Regions:
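Short glycine-enriched loops at secondary-structure junctions
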Residues: 38-41, 114-118
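Charge-dense polyanion-binding interfaces
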Residues: 89-90, 170, 218-230
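Internal, active-site/partner-interface "lid" segment
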Residues: 143, 155-194
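Short, well-ordered secondary-structure micro-motifs
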Residues: 46, 96-98, 121-123
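N-terminal nucleotide/polyanion-binding subdomain common to many enzyme families
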Residues: 1-75, 197-225
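Structured adenosyl-cofactor binding patch, chiefly the S-adenosyl-L-methionine
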Residues: 122-169
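Hydrophobic/aromatic beta-strand patches that form the interior of the parallel beta-sheet core
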Residues: 4-6, 34-36, 85, 108-109, ...
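S-adenosyl-L-methionine/SAH cofactor-binding core of RNA-modifying enzymes
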Residues: 63-114
Length: 230
């Protein structure tokens, strides 16, 4: 998979997406993440990518043409049109199911918004999907783009050492993850559940499923309602 990110602040992504697991995946060739400086596609002497909104109002809007030129350049670089995502508080809230679907997409381009948003004409003509990471507003789309890119990347085959690394996690199957424990078996008088040390895989699996349901009912009852509808 290749992920292209259009942003005013490419330097923000370096320590997040080029280190640890995702960094290793890029070095191995399983994943490629490329950041594009939007100002490189603004051709006035001040490299402006924003302007005042028609009709008045607070703040500035990102102009359509620099974004269009940058996206068209991305298309030329990869030889095809990628799925174009705009990180926006107006978008659909990102869910694990959508990540599973997008993990099969070979090329994805992410637009990071800034200021008061983006000229609607650009959104209408170019954007395939708007995605939000929650019902709140941030100062820009860079942090949401990092969240999306990280969550998406780990779903790509070969990024994690074993698919069970994510198939056992919260949200993947519609439930929250079961409690987990490590050594020592007794910590400050608190013991690890005996079943986990029994070596009986069927009983362990049964315990984990029951605990996942308990945890989900306690912390996210609305998720359990959806799970029970399946």
């Amino acid at each position: 998979m290749r992920i292209d990110i259009i942003t005013l602040f490419p330097e923000m992504f370096e320590p997040v997406l080029n280190g640890s697991i995702i960094g290793r995946a890029q070095k191995s060739g399983v994943l490629e993440i490329v950041c594009h400086q939007l100002r490189d596609y603004a051709f006035d002497k001040h490299k402006r990518v924003d302007d005042t909104p028609y009709g008045g109002g607070m703040g500035m809007l990102m102009k359509a043409e620099p974004i269009a030129l940058c996206f068209e350049d991305v298309c030329k670089q990869i030889g095809k049109r990628p799925h174009f995502v705009y990180m926006s508080p107006q978008g659909k809230t990102l869910k694990q199911q959508r990540l599973r679907e997008l993990a099969d997409v070979e090329n994805i381009c992410i637009l990071c918004g800034h200021y008061e948003g983006v000229d609607q004409r650009l959104l209408d003509e170019f954007i395939d999907e708007e995605i939000s990471i929650g019902d709140y507003v941030l100062t820009g789309g860079e942090i949401p783009a990092m969240v999306f890119a990280d969550a998406l990347s780990r779903m790509v085959p070969g990024v994690l050492s074993n698919n069970e690394c994510f198939t056992e996690e919260s949200h993947f199957n519609g439930l929250l993850e079961y409690p987990q424990y490590t050594k020592p078996s007794v910590w400050r008088g608190k013991e690890v559940p005996e079943v986990l040390m029994s070596g009986h895989h069927a009983n362990i699996e049964k315990w984990r499923k029951e605990k996942s349901i308990e945890v989900t009912a306690l912390k996210r009852p609305e998720m359990l309602e959806e799970y029970n509808k399946k």
